[in-house]
Amino acid sequence: KILYLLFAFLFLAFLSEPGNAYKRCHIKGGHCFPKEKICIPPSSDFGKMDCPWRRKSLKKGSGK
């Protein structure tokens, strides 16, 4: 049983490489923020996308 748990842990560790995290959000120029954060124009709210639980993808506007 311990070997099964060890294998599962290592498998999940390789799946969660930081370079691949939240790719869809980052392609749009966004970052994952807490879901409660309010998006004020000219910022863009892309919704959940591929952000983790209770977070959403936001792109901060230029403010010009």
From Swiss-Prot:
Q: Point out the signal peptide segment.
A: 1-21
Instruction: List GO terms (cellular component aspect).
Output: extracellular region
Q: Which Pfam families match?
A: Myotoxins
State the Gene Ontology terms under molecular function.
potassium channel regulator activity; toxin activity
Please give the biological process terms from Gene Ontology that the record holds: envenomation resulting in occlusion of the pore of voltage-gated potassium channel in another organism
Please list the tissues where expression of this protein has been recorded: Expressed by the venom gland.
Where does this protein reside within or beyond the cell?
Secreted
Keyword line: Antimicrobial, Disulfide bond, Ion channel impairing toxin, Myotoxin, Neurotoxin, Potassium channel impairing toxin, Secreted, Signal, Toxin, Voltage-gated potassium channel impairing toxin
The chain's disulfide connectivity reads 32-51
Please name the InterPro entries in this protein's record: Myo_ane_neurotoxin_sf, Myotoxin
By sequence similarity, the record places it as follows: Belongs to the crotamine-myotoxin family.
Biological function: Cationic peptide that possesses multiple functions. It acts as a cell-penetrating peptide (CPP), and as a potent voltage-gated potassium channel (Kv) inhibitor. It exhibits antimicrobial activities, hind limb paralysis, and severe muscle necrosis by a non-enzymatic mechanism.
* Subunit annotation: Monomer.
Q: Can you name this protein?
A: Myotoxin-2
Q: Which organism is it from?
A: Crotalus durissus terrificus
Q: What is the lineage of its organism?
A: Eukaryota, Metazoa, Chordata, Craniata, Vertebrata
